[in-house]
Amino acid sequence: MSVPVPEFAFELALCARLEATTDWLPARQLGGGVAARGRRVVDVCAVVPGPGFDERAAVAPGEIPAPVLEGSVGVGEAVPAAEALDCPPERREAVVERAVDLGVLERERRGGRTLVRRTTRYPEGWFDRLIAVENKPDLDRPGDLRRQLRHDAAVGLFDEVVLATADHVTGAHLNRIPDAVGVWRVDPATGERTVVRDPAALPVDEPGIEPVAERPDRTEVAVVAPAEKAQVRRRIAERAYGKGWRTYDPPPCASAAVTDDGRPRCTHFDRVVDPATECGRDCPGFERDAPPDFDPAALRDARTPWGADPEGAGRRQAGLDRFG
């Protein structure tokens, strides 16, 4: 009986490898639904840069809030935030504050109202493709794998969908998943991948069919329009751009270390660990100490096209009201 491969370590190894061998921007744990947005979470989403990527990189290092991109805020005359941003009043101020902090909005106050304008135009076409990767290192423990992959293939939200596994892949395995889904066999230690089957391009510009609820006797579905998919695709790309995959903090332990590519490693167990679930007082190797140095932004800046501190037009123009 084989020893199970921890999914967290497997996922990080793959992200690190993709980062080292492509110009993609991998990010972890992103929503992958349209009609039922909290129902599907994708393990890894890789953003493939498009022709306008440098323009996007020059705007801001973080995720631009969706209400700013989808609202009626332009680069010309300042408009009332309450009218231009489609979000609950209790959230609006935080959205404006975040966008101003990023340098994508200027803010002013007139007559007790908050007015906003964009500092620069948003570059369309900055990403070329979105690639969803479902990690299942052990195919003998598939869980909801078949349902998840069928969902992704039917919705067509991502340009390509791939199953990543550490197992030997048989014809029987391939027959259980949609033909459009690609398969990678991934070394769980290094993240090195072998293509077992290439993914097919999914129809992202066509309507999709999304399962939204499952009953004992039927599955309820929703038809998602191309415009809805395009909006969610941009949200996913923005989320991935701002989030990345190093979304953890090393624990305050003498055994804690960080690999050169930024994965949390335990010297006591000599392996990559998940700080959120494996570290703490209950661990036999725990010895309280200062956590190791860890700068995920610097690592990402050095290893990808993403920039931690862009000198873009948005930031320069935002200097007028930064932010009062």
How would you describe each model-predicted region?
Residues 133, 162-164, 182-184:
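Hydrophobic/aromatic beta-strand patches that form the interior of the parallel beta-sheet core
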Residues 1-23, 27-42, 55-57, 68, ...:
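Nuclease catalytic cores
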Residues 34-58, 173-175, 180-182:
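Internal hydrophobic scaffold segments of catalytic domains
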Residues 142-178:
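Short, charged, amphipathic alpha-helix that recurs within catalytic cores of restriction-modification
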Residues 43-144:
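Conserved catalytic cores of phosphodiester-cleaving nucleases, focusing on short active-site segments
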Residues 2, 16, 20, 90, ...:
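Non-catalytic C-terminal interaction segments of nucleic acid-processing enzymes
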Residues 39-40, 127-128, 156-159, 179, ...:
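Structured loop/turn residues at beta-strand edges in well-structured enzyme cores
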Residues 33-35, 120-123, 150-152, 172-174:
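Short, flexible, glycine/charge-rich loop motifs used to bind or transfer phosphoryl groups or to couple energy/partner
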